[in-house]
Amino acid sequence: MKYVYLFLPAIGWGLMPLVIASVKNSTVYNQIVGTVAASFIFGAIVMAIMHPAMSWSLFLLSALGGACWVIGQVGQYISYEKIGVSETMPISTGLQLIGVPLVGVLAFGEWSSPQAKLYGFIGILVLIIGVVLTSFTDRGTSEGNKSNQVSTIILLVLTSLGYITSSSIPKALHGNSVSIFFGQTFGMLVAVFIYTLVTKNLHVWKEKSTVQSGGAGILYAIAALAYILSVQDNGVNMAFVISQLCVVISTLGGLIFLHEKKTRKGLIFTIAGLILIIGGAMLTTLF
């Protein structure tokens, strides 16, 4: 089963954007509410079955991480609409792969040896080049005009800070992984409720498109739980690197199944960028 747990996160997180993009007549509000509500229900069921111990400090910090995740996910969903899944995912994933290791080095003392620092910073450089390549837009693509692309990339950079914070908080926590996951889904639920309340979009909670978007939430939750189990069976480095293959599935899936168009030059740059992103991820985690 450890190999199932190893590859399930990449499959689930890779298919998640494709499921969201396939829901007709859905807005960002439908998508984020459906995703989060389904994730919370899944997390609550797992919590009820396994009954892990949980302290208030663990719960509150996990919830904070979940709230930060919502910031990143909203930015990603907006980007799907603006520039497409096939361009959003490599950029978003690359930014997270750059940010999370840097937080680990600065806040948690990771990459303690000179060799680890050397490979780590080379990996970050490779990741940056990969992100730049995947953001290349040639004429005839479906990503929109240049100003639209630049503004969307800026949005991704800013909202990816939410992802980075969400991924970094659990490193400071010591507790059952299922408890942390449930706390995160609760924080996600509260954050999304506040988001829809402030933007006066509470009506989306009962719309059909919101329910249909719940499929993405189930995929996210299953992948997240499988990732926790994969870390236990395969180690954090191997589990993390393999999970990042989700970017390949979502990017190629956007091109093949969602019919997002790129010219030959744009496609070459995208594939080259994907290879560099995966290579950079390996350098920053396996060495």
Curated annotation (Swiss-Prot):
The chain crosses the membrane at residues 4-23, 28-50, 56-78, 91-108, 118-137, 150-169, 179-198, 211-230, 240-259, 266-285. This is Putative sugar uptake protein LJ_0170. Its main location: membrane. GO terms for molecular function: carbohydrate transmembrane transporter activity. GO terms for cellular component: plasma membrane. It is a multi-pass membrane protein. Keywords: Cell membrane, Membrane, Sugar transport, Transmembrane, Transmembrane helix, Transport. It holds the Pfam family Sugar_transport. It is found in: Cell membrane. Belongs to the GRP transporter (TC 2.A.7.5) family. The keyword Electron transport does not apply. It comes from Lactobacillus johnsonii (strain CNCM I-12250 / La1 / NCC 533). PANTHER family: TRANSMEMBRANE PROTEIN 144.
